[in-house]
Regions:
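Preference for protein termini
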Residues: 1-333
C-alpha cells in the first residue's frame, strides 16, 4: 500500500527523508486536525460541520480490509449525516481528521467527492488509502527525543467532517509553504496545464500573499506548515481549504522539498507553463491507489459504476430493514 495522506497526497522520495526538516512532533500533526483549526479560520474557510467522536464501531468498519456493507447499522450517525446534508442544500464532501478520500473518486458516479447520502460517504471512505493512512499512520513521521518514548499510533478520537459542496475549478487551487512563519513558495495544485493562469499569475500571487498576511500569518499553531487555498473564478475571494504538516509526507507538488527548505526571500510562485511540462510533471493522480483488488473480486463482471450503485442500494435496504425492525420492537413494548 502507498503511504498517502489527506490533502497531503504524498508518496515521498526516499532522499527526502534525509533532508533537514524541522522536528515534527505529535502536536504538530494534531494541530492540523480539522477541528483544531477550523473555528479560528471559519470566516475564511468553506462551511463545514464536524461529527465527533465517531463511534468506535464505525472506525473499526472503516479500518477493516475490503469494501463491504457494515455488519451493523449506525442510525444515529446516519441521521446526523442526513441533517447536515439537508442543511448544506443536499450535497457535501467528506474528510476525516486530516484526509479527504481524493484517491477514491474513481468509484463515484461523478468522479468527484460530491456526496448526497450516507452511502455515498461510506463508499468513498471505505475505498480510500488516504483514509486508511489517517486511521493507522498519521504519526509515522513524528520525531521522538527518546526511542523508548511512547509512540502514538492514532488520535484519541476520530471525526467526520462534512463540508458544503461547491463546483470549484481545480485550476484555481494552490498550495502554500510556510517556513518559520514566512511564506516561501506557492504551487499550482492541480498539475495540468491551464493557459489562462499565466495571464493572471501576478494577480493571483498578490491575492494569495495578501490573504496569508491578513488571515493566516502568525495565527496558526505551528511555525512551519503547509496550507491550501482556493481562489474564486472571479478572483474576488480566497478561501482557506486545509492545513498540512511541513514535512515529507506532504506533497511538494512543483517543488522538491530541498528547494522549499532552502528557499529565502520573497515567495516563488510556480505554474505549469505548457502541456509538455504538465505531462512531465505528473502521472495520473493517485494511479497507484485506483481499483483495489477486492473491487474486482466482488464486482463479478460489473462495471465500477454498477458496483457502486449496488453498494448504495444494498446499504439503503439494510438501513430500511433496520428501521422496520426498530418499529416492530417499539410496537411490542
Amino acid at each position: 500500500m502507498p503511504v498517502p495522506t489527506g490533502n497531503r497526497e504524498s508518496q515521498p522520495h526516499l532522499t527526502e527523508t534525509s533532508l533537514p526538516f524541522p522536528p515534527l512532533t505529535e502536536q504538530h500533526i494534531l494541530n492540523c486536525t480539522f477541528s483544531s483549526w477550523y473555528n479560528n479560520f471559519r470566516r475564511v474557510s468553506i462551511k463545514s460541520k464536524i461529527i465527533k467522536p465517531l463511534p468506535e464501531e464505525f472506525v473499526e468498519y472503516l479500518h477493516a480490509d475490503g469494501v463491504f456493507l457494515p455488519e451493523q447499522n449506525f442510525p444515529d450517525l446516519e441521521q446526523q449525516i442526513w441533517d447536515i446534508i439537508d442543511e448544506f442544500d443536499g450535497s457535501v464532501f467528506p474528510k476525516l481528521n486530516w484526509s479527504s478520500p481524493r484517491d477514491a473518486t474513481w468509484i463515484s458516479a461523478t468522479n468527484t467527492l460530491k456526496c448526497n447520502s450516507p452511502s455515498d460517504i461510506f463508499l468513498l471512505l471505505k475505498s480510500s488509502d488516504f483514509i486508511a493512512h489517517d486511521l493507522d499512520h498519521a504519526f509515522d513521521d513524528c520525531y521522538y527525543d527518546n526511542q523508548s518514548d511512547s509512540r502514538r499510533h492514532r488520535p484519541n478520537e476520530f471525526e467526520l467532517v462534512l463540508r458544503k459542496w461547491y463546483d470549484v475549478a481545480p485550476s484555481m487551487e494552490f498550495r502554500c509553504f510556510v517556513k518559520e512563519e514566512e511564506l516561501v513558495a506557492i504551487s499550482q495544485r492541480d498539475v495540468n496545464y491551464y493557459s489562462f493562469l499565466n495571464d493572471i499569475k501576478e494577480e493571483l500571487e498578490t491575492k494569495i500573499i495578501q490573504f496569508f498576511e491578513t488571515h493566516v500569518q502568525n495565527k496558526f499553531f505551528n511555525r512551519d506548515y503547509v496550507f491550501d487555498v482556493y481562489v474564486t473564478r472571479n478572483r474576488e475571494r480566497v478561501w482557506l481549504i486545509d492545513f498540512n504538516p511541513f514535512g515529507p509526507m506532504t506533497d511538494g507538488l512543483m517543488y522538491t522539498w530541498e528547494e522549499i527548505l532552502t528557499a529565502t526571500g520573497p515567495p516563488s510562485f510556480r505554474l505549469i507553463t505548457s502541456q509538455t511540462e504538465a505531462s512531465q510533471s505528473r502521472s495520473r493522480p493517485f494511479a497507484v491507489n485506483r481499483y483495489p483488488r477486492e473491487i474486482f473480486d466482488l464486482s463479478q463482471g460489473q462495471t465500477i459504476a454498477e458496483f457502486a450503485e449496488q453498494f448504495q442500494r444494498e446499504l439503503a435496504i439494510a438501513v430500511s430493514s433496520s428501521d422496520e425492525e426498530e418499529n416492530d420492537n417499539e410496537d411490542n413494548v
